[in-house]
């Protein structure tokens, strides 16, 4: 059977929260089958566990934020994206603040941590959410949609009307049957505009943001000396975010995702819309890995390779 996965050993790192600017210690620990991805605020007098769940996402204005009884864990999308890309089903994530550290602004550090810990198959069937009917959410001209598809593919279109973004392409379509998440998506960094960063800092946000963890643009160009990691890094980062946002549903999706100018809020609304229509999906497992969609085998150590 196609089995669930966790990590083999505990790994730790330290970073800063992109909005608080505060130091955050992050520890990843193995978890038993059917645990899911569970975030734990270990800095509190009594640690609070918050399982990743579409219905636990609260604030989505600047990041995807898990909330439970007034306790928050913010900016979970890059780590969740890495877990999706590497096929991690079960994991404990201990943090000493309310933000997951931003690291370099991509999912690459989290991929490295998970690969360093080692990936271990578990004696339990991996569960997928198979979309059986189309589901769509719209907000003005923005939309996000899931269609039935035996695999996982995404088509994302952005519209930033900026010379540097225009040059790199505003649309990307990826099918993970023939694309490596680690090579092609994981290193894409978050990005922002210099004038917006200043406004956010005046509001007490983006205190940890810098060119070490984001692509920064002025009105005309990219300000980072080292330029881009991918020719189409902007749209690839939006896809990286979407993969993480979608993975909070608790299992990998078997679906085709299409989005235009979508963000954390619309992605979460799409998951809630799917879950509200039980006839639009089913939970499936694969007794024979050969019958599973291409790209979910364990041999390559990744889900999408």
From Swiss-Prot:
SUPFAM superfamilies: Ribosomal protein S5 domain 2-like (SSF54211). It comes from Burkholderia mallei (strain ATCC 23344). The active site is at residue 264. GO terms for molecular function: metal ion binding; UDP-3-O-acyl-N-acetylglucosamine deacetylase activity. GO terms for biological process: lipid A biosynthetic process. The lineage of its organism: Bacteria, Pseudomonadati, Pseudomonadota, Betaproteobacteria, Burkholderiales. The keyword Hydrolase applies. Belongs to the LpxC family. This is UDP-3-O-acyl-N-acetylglucosamine deacetylase.
């Amino acid at each position: 059977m196609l089995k669930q996965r966790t990590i083999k050993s505990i790994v730790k790192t330290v970073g800063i929260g992109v909005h608080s600017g505060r130091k955050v210690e992050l520890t990843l620990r193995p978890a038993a089958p059917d645990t899911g991805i569970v975030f734990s605020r270990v800095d509190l007098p009594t640690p609070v566990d918050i399982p990743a769940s579409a219905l636990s996402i609260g604030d989505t204005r600047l990041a995807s934020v898990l909330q439970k009884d007034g306790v928050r864990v913010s900016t979970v999308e890059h780590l969740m994206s890495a877990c999706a890309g590497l096929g991690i089903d079960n994991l404990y994530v201990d943090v000493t603040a309310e933000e997951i550290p931003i690291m370099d602004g991509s999912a690459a550090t989290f991929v490295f941590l998970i690969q360093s810990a080692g990936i271990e198959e578990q004696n339990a069937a991996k569960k997928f959410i198979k979309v059986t009917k189309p589901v769509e959410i719209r907000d003005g001209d923005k939309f996000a949609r899931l269609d039935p598809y035996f695999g996982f593919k995404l088509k994302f279109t952005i519209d930033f009307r900026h010379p540097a973004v225009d040059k790199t392409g505003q649309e990307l379509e990826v099918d993970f049957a023939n694309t490596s998440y680690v090579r092609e998506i994981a290193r894409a960094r978050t990005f922002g505009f210099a004038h917006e960063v200043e406004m956010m800092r005046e509001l007490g946000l983006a205190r940890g943001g810098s060119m070490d963890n984001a692509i920064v643009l002025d009105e005309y160009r990219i300000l980072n000396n080292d330029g881009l990691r991918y020719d189409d890094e902007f749209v690839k980062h939006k896809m990286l975010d979407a993969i993480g946002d979608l993975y909070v549903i608790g299992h990998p999706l078997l679906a085709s995702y299409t989005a235009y100018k979508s963000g954390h809020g619309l992605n979460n609304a799409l998951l809630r819309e799917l879950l509200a229509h039980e006839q639009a999906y089913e939970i499936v497992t694969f007794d024979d890995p050969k019958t599973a969609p291409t790209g979910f085998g364990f041999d390559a150590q990744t889900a999408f390779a």
